[in-house]
C-alpha cells in the first residue's frame, strides 16, 4: 500500500528519469504517523531494489525519480 502511494505520487507529478523530487516531498503522501516510520523506509528500499525508483543525492538531499526503463513493470504493479 505504501509503495503504491509513493508510485502514484511520482506518476501524478510525471517524475521520470532526469526529473526528480526530494524524498521529503514523497513522504508527504503518507499520513503523519507513517512518515519516517520503519514501514515507509522498507517500502522505499523495496522500490529501489525492484529498480522502480532511482535515488540521487542532489544539493545534499536524497532525490527520487521513476525509472523510465521499468515503465511497463511500474504500470503493471499499479494495476495489481
Q: What residue ranges belong to the model's regions?
A:
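Short alpha-helical segments that sit at the start of domains
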Residues: 1-18, 78-80
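Short acidic, hydrophobic short linear motifs in intrinsically disordered regions
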Residues: 16-30
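Short amphipathic alpha-helical interaction segments
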Residues: 33-49
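Charged interaction/catalytic cores of defense and host-pathogen modules
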Residues: 42-44, 55, 64
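A short, conserved structural fragment
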Residues: 48-58
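Minor-groove-contacting beta-hairpin "wing" of winged helix-turn-helix DNA-binding domains
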Residues: 60-67
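Short, amphipathic alpha-helical interaction segments positioned at domain boundaries
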Residues: 69-80
